[in-house]
Amino acid sequence: MEYTGSEYKGERLHGRLEGKGEYILPTETRYEGEMKDGMFHGQGTLFFPNGSKYVALWDHGIALQGKYTFADGLEYDKEDWRYCDQYDRRFYTEICDGLKPAGRSQLTDLDPPRKIPDGCYDCGDGFYNPLTRVVNDYQHKFLRNADDDEHEWIIQKCRKGWDETTGYRPKQSQSTKT
């Protein structure tokens, strides 16, 4: 663990992580639960630095079933995910606390929203710099490098740190396209 920057407190068997324990990754994500032969095995929970958590049943490091809960208490539902979709654009705090009056609309679930550094995007767990393709957490510590799919998703879907004036864009018909 000294090589990875991880930390483990818990039971061992023949020098291997085995039984109940707490495993802390260098990103400060923490696993509490059962281990077998050095892997998550049995009931266990991942606690993320942003306050969210994933409670799961693990089999040799693979989550067989689990439930993700965001820091604000919203639970992810894989089958019927209706949060902030085309039918209901409210953030979870607006669902719980009601909408704000006109002129004070929320830009994010967090109100007031975080200030995004110039040239970056807020991707939900940190700020993304498209030039370096690096995601840093909100305290500006490295989280990960974005692959091509995540890069495209962030560019298309996430809030950016600058304003763009787009103006009216009439829908072009097929005959007027060049």
UniProtKB/Swiss-Prot annotation:
Protein keywords: Cell projection, Cilium, Flagellum, Repeat
MORN repeats: 8-30, 31-53, 54-75
Cell location: Cell projection, Cilium, Flagellum
InterPro entries referenced in this protein's UniProt entry, alphabetically: MORN (IPR003409), Morn5 (IPR042814)
Primary location class: other
A GO CC term attached to the entry: sperm flagellum
Protein name: MORN repeat-containing protein 5
Gene: morn5
